[in-house]
């Protein structure tokens, strides 16, 4: 009886390896296709699941999906209100492997304006060029990554819930509010910001570097995480409870 159980376990392990190999080969050797989706009139982007989205601000609307054919077919793009919604239709096979650059799926998006980025899950949002808008809301819930090179706006709201990362390499804004709940990380580089409010609840980290013409920063820390401030501001205040730290060793305050 025990011998039969061992044999059955061995067969199941071999089948699992074979299934994984088949799915892996499907992603690696499958034909790469490019598909254009006809969607217009959006000013927000919502990503649900694991897609990677590359955004560029432009005069026109465009949505292009590129990757292995079965994965392209697995991506749904649709308009809901003011938002372009990008999501996975479902898993491909039992294991969804992507090996190497040739096996990766990417959704390329352009629009004249962008006022909201919402990422729910483990996907990625990447913008390598300037986004020029009046107000932008950037929200991440999950383990994904949002990486924005350059933003110029009047107001910027940043919210992270979970273990993901938000990196804003350059933000030129009058008003910025950033909130982190969980174990994730927010990294900000600010220019010309009159009011900055940073709130952390949990074990994550917020890093903010203040460059030219930044005025006031308010920090609220609840938990074991850290807020690390660098650069120069005119006013600084903090509220703290828990074992975390608000580091100001590299912050200069000059009223």
Where are these regions (language model features)?
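Poly-acidic low-complexity segments
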Residues: 70-71, 118, 147, 167, ...
């Amino acid at each position: 009886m025990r011998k039969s159980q061992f044999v059955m376990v061995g067969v199941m392990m071999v089948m699992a390896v074979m299934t994984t190999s088949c799915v892996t080969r499907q992603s690696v050797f499958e034909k790469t296709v490019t598909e254009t989706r006809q969607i217009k009139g959006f000013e927000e982007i919502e990503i649900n699941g694991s897609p990677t989205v590359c955004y560029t601000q432009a005069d026109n609307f465009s949505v292009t999906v590129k990757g292995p054919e079965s994965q392209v077919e697995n991506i749904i793009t649709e308009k809901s209100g003011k938002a372009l919604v990008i999501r996975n239709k479902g898993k491909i096979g039992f294991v969804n492997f992507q090996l190497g650059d040739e096996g990766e799926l990417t959704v390329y998006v352009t629009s004249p304006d962008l006022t909201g980025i919402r990422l729910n899950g483990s996907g990625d949002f990447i913008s390598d060029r300037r986004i020029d808008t009046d107000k932008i809301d950037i929200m991440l819930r999950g383990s994904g990554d949002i990486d924005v090179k350059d933003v110029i706006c009047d107001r910027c709201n940043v919210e992270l819930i979970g273990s993901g990362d938000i990196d804003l390499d350059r933000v030129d804004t009058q008003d910025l509010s950033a909130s982190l709940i969980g174990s994730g990380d927010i990294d900000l580089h600010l220019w010309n910001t009159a009011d900055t409010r940073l709130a952390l609840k949990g074990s994550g980290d917020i890093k903010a570097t203040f460059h030219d013409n930044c005025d006031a920063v308010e920090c609220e820390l609840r938990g074991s995480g850290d807020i690390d401030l660098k650069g120069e501001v005119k006013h600084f205040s903090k509220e703290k409870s828990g074992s975390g730290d608000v580091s100001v060793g590299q912050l200069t305050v000059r009223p």
